[in-house]
Amino acid sequence: MSVEKTNQSWGGRFSEPVDAFVARFTASVDFDKRLYRHDIMGSIAHATMLAKVGVLSDAERDAIVDGLQQIQAEIEAGSFDWRVDLEDVHMNIEARLTDRIGVTGKKLHTGRSRNDQVATDIRLWLRDEIDTILAEITRLQQGLLGLAEAEADTIMPGFTHLQTAQPVTFGHHLLAWFEMLGRDYERLVDCHRRVNRMPLGSAALAGTTYPIQREITCQLLGFEAIGGNSLDGVSDRDFAIEFCAAASLAMMHLSRFSEELVLWTSAQFQFIDLPDRFCTGSSIMPQKKNPDVPELVRGKSGRVFGALTGLLTLMKGQPLAYNKDNQEDKEPLFDAADTLRDSLRAFADMVPAIRPRREVMREAARRGFSTATDLADYLVRKGLPFRDCHEIVGHAVKYGVDSGKDLAEMSLDELRRFSEQIDADVFAVLTLEGSVNARDHIGGTAPNQVRAAVARGRQLLAQR
């Protein structure tokens, strides 16, 4: 039987080349080449460790390290020839290394498999991505604090069911988003801890017979811990799923914020104005100024939710250890990280530039009987049970709807028709300022509480 040499580095067992379509179908280099820097970083650490344990000579290590550094320079200069027939980022770099330094390049993979190599690359890459995303969250939170401080006294309607509920300050509303982003930050920090565990040394699935010292590569690569089981090390993608879950929550928060910004910029609300640089126009309607940034972020949240669902579905049927299915982990992970990072960047740039229309907000807060709860609380302080007060104020509101008057616009005689406990001091309660100032406790909407919350927020950010 004649044997035709295969076209792969693993071709010894095979008698014919991989089908051309199959080679393209199974190749991942088009998307995993973005891991090149982390792949080279891992390879340099691996070669350094192999030299320390005597598997490589110092001269071989130096040749490998120098060759890898030159390859990185080629890639970053745009002169590297990525080949689909070499499947992935790992084999492209290894083949080029062998071209550059000869047979020594073939020794780099000693004691290592692409299974633990790619698991290491992804963790190194995601670790850096999380750091970048955390910095963007902090930048957005700083912008929210600055705007909240400037608008601590600006009164707007607070909503439930998108109906006017109670007056709040715009600063207080903005700080709600600060709190949500704080939880996102904490989740990603926690995720970072589990990302930062080293699988390198797990080899294909069972470890290696070479006298490796994983502590060396762990220290060189800055991992916090070494993975304790080689089977789990090569097959675990929990960290990617966890990141996409945290990213989904963050994008959900940005999507909710986006929805409010879209509403607030509309002609029906007109609460805020976004600078032109964050908006676009219409190809047919000359008057249009569309809030495309928040609209697009709202839409992009679905991509990240899809990445989470995709990874969960990808992993749910896999037996131990590594399976080719896991090649499909990268594109959703990459896309989720890119989408979250860019969405945060867009918001961090845009939020400090928001221009509130204070008088429009205030006028909106005056409508819809927003101080009705304050009137009920006033009657409670007069000694009436809250449920009775609730009913009394409900009757007053109905009268206001029928007569076209807000509670604060009614005369004392009109108000006393509903309870003789109402005196002239009620009008201090029914003002917008009286309503927000009365909620003077930690987490409340009173302007001084908003300023205190801003101070606490800045202290928190300074400690990061």
Swiss-Prot record:
Keywords carried by this UniProt record: Amino-acid biosynthesis, Arginine biosynthesis, Cytoplasm, Lyase
Gene3D superfamilies: Fumarase/aspartase (C-terminal domain), Fumarase/aspartase (Central domain), Fumarase/aspartase (N-terminal domain)
Enzyme class: lyase
GO cellular component, one term: cytosol
Enzyme nomenclature, EC number: 4.3.2.1
One Pfam family, short name: ASL_C2
InterPro entries: Arg_succ_lyase_C, Argininosuccinate_lyase, Fumarase/histidase_N, Fumarate_lyase_CS, Fumarate_lyase_fam, Fumarate_lyase_N, L-Aspartase-like
Claim: Lyase is one of the keywords in the record: yes
GO BP, one annotated term: arginine biosynthetic process via ornithine
Catalytic activity: 2-(N(omega)-L-arginino)succinate = fumarate + L-arginine
Domain of life: Bacteria
Subcellular location(s) per record: Cytoplasm
The protein's annotated pathway: Amino-acid biosynthesis; L-arginine biosynthesis; L-arginine from L-ornithine and carbamoyl phosphate: step 3/3
Entries under NCBIfam families matching the protein: argH
HAMAP family (UniProt xref): Arg_succ_lyase
Family the UniProt entry places it in: Belongs to the lyase 1 family. Argininosuccinate lyase subfamily.
Protein name: Argininosuccinate lyase
